[in-house]
């Protein structure tokens, strides 16, 4: 070892344990445009000051460990350490704080969501000094955004591929999600697409089970969508779930989908993992496939308000990793989703530039520069009576997906699809004429039902179905 190295490492080194805040709490720090910024909801253990808790988060998610180490002298901690630069008390909550942490960009591998999340949320969430910890938001700097491909195609390219403009896209998840044979599954796909839907979908847990192997499903679904296209003159798609037990098997399924000439494949990005997802997204761009993303397992991570990771972070991570659609909740259906919070992360998915807006849960201004946008997918417990609200909430750049709300129609699958298409066209027409969908929605649906027996039957079946439960995740006061 050289004398210079020995001198650098030994000068000022003192073994032992010292408070994190002495090194990692820096309220005077001015954040840089190249820093990744994080907002953590911190609940310290009794007796732990908030400054120490915030500094511990910064340390344990960057360069720190529980004791001083000799090798600290071999690098520049000031260059590489995370810094807790601000602490806010959460109004209305006992012993909860928002700790803002800045991370130098050099801590992260270029183009790797996997590495970014491993660093920021990898170990620190099990830290004993904290009762609970939640990552509320991230600011991804432009310098880091530009190292990612992002969505394979984006909203405008998808519309051009489908030749569909001026309205939300319509989809349907095939039910029952498990148990159908491949041929009966394909039959349901055909009936729904023939009836007027743009897409049908594999459910998240449809992979390759004994009752329906993936290759058989792909073949029958391809036959169904090409037949429906020929009959309707519209471009159709079915989300063929390529999720598999290995990346190699996943890619084999995606390649087969491309060889069949189908326009879109699907991936469960959280259970499948970010490395697999980014690999698939790159393949989809190179080979002209759209990529639908399901967020299965998200509520395990994001539903509790004081611990875990907010979905807006998972949404940003998905936009970086790559996907053309992602499920986003419905606000009005059976799944968790408060309106302002949902609209906040929907904007983070679709827009190029999003201003900080705490009223919608957005902690940082985010500039995506040229990264393509992602279509939010509203799915889960929705039916024709929800159509005005969904059109008003999500606007044109969205996918409205009715599973039971299509296949549960009393006359069958194709009439269920007709009912949804008529309801959507009526709502878009009324909106374009200046009518208030939020106030006049039920009247608009009733008027359309006079001319569509399929819609009238759907209205009768689901007239009393509501899901009135308070959201678990709400904005701070």
Curated annotation (Swiss-Prot):
Taken from the record, one Pfam family name reads: RuBisCO_large_N
Q: Where is this site: Transition state stabilizer?
A: 334
Where is Mg(2+) bound in this sequence? 201, 203-204
Question: What SUPFAM superfamilies does UniProt report for this protein, alphabetically?
Answer: RuBisCo, C-terminal domain, RuBisCO, large subunit, small (N-terminal) domain
Modification sites for N-acetylproline? 3
Query: Where, by residue number, is the active site?
Result: 175, 294
Any further remark recorded for this protein: The basic functional RuBisCO is composed of a large chain homodimer in a 'head-to-tail' conformation. In form I RuBisCO this homodimer is arranged in a barrel-like tetramer with the small subunits forming a tetrameric 'cap' on each end of the 'barrel'.
Q: What does this protein do?
A: RuBisCO catalyzes two reactions: the carboxylation of D-ribulose 1,5-bisphosphate, the primary event in carbon dioxide fixation, as well as the oxidative fragmentation of the pentose substrate in the photorespiration process. Both reactions occur simultaneously and in competition at the same active site.
Q: What is the name of this protein? A: Ribulose bisphosphate carboxylase large chain
Which species?
Solanum tuberosum
């Amino acid at each position: 070892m050289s004398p210079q190295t020995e001198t650098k490492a030994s000068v000022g080194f003192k073994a032992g344990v010292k408070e994190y805040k002495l090194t990692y709490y820096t309220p005077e720090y001015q954040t840089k445009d190249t820093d990744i910024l994080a907002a953590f909801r911190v609940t310290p253990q009794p007796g732990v000051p908030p400054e120490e808790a915030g500094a511990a988060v910064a340390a344990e998610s960057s360069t720190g460990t529980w004791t001083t180490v000799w090798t600290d002298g071999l690098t520049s901690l000031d260059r590489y350490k995370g810094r807790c630069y601000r602490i806010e008390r959460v109004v209305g909550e006992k012993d909860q704080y928002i700790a803002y942490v800045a991370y130098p960009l050099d801590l992260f591998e270029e183009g790797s969501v996997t590495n970014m999340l491993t660093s920021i949320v990898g170990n620190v969430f099990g830290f004993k000094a904290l009762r609970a910890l939640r990552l509320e938001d991230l600011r991804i700097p432009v310098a880091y955004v530009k190292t990612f491909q992002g969505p394979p195609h984006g909203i405008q390219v998808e519309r051009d591929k489908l030749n569909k403009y001026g309205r939300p896209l319509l989809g349907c998840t095939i039910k029952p999600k498990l148990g159908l044979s491949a041929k009966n599954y394909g039959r349901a796909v055909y009936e729904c697409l023939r009836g007027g839907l743009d897409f049908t979908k594999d459910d998240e847990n449809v992979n390759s089970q004994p009752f329906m192997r993936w290759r058989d499903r792909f073949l029958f679904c391809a036959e169904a969508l090409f037949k429906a296209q020929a009959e309707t003159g519209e471009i159709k798609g079915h989300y063929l779930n390529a999720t598999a037990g290995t990346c190699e098997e996943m890619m084999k399924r995606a390649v087969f989908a491309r060889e069949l000439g189908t326009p879109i494949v699907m991936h469960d990005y959280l259970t499948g993992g970010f490395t697999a997802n980014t690999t698939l997204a790159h393949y989809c761009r190179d080979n002209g496939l759209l990529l639908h993303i399901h967020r299965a397992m998200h509520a395990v991570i994001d539903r509790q308000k004081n611990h875990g990771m907010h979905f807006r972070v998972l949404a940003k991570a998905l936009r970086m990793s790559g996907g053309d659609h992602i499920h986003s909740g419905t606000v009005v259906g059976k799944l968790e989703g408060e309106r302002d919070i949902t609209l906040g992360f929907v904007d983070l998915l679709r827009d190029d530039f999003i201003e900080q807006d705490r009223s919608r849960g957005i902690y940082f201004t985010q500039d995506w520069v040229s990264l393509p946008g992602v279509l939010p997918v509203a799915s889960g417990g929705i039916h024709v009576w929800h159509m005005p609200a969904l059109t008003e909430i999500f606007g044109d750049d969205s996918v409205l997906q009715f599973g039971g709300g299509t296949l549960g129609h009393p006359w069958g699958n194709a009439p269920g699809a007709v009912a949804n298409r008529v309801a959507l066209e009526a709502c878009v027409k009324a909106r374009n004429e200046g009518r208030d969908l939020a106030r006049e929605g039920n009247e608009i649906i009733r008027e359309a039902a006079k001319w569509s027996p399929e819609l009238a039957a759907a209205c009768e079946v689901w007239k009393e179905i509501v899901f009135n439960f308070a959201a678990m995740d709400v904005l701070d006061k």
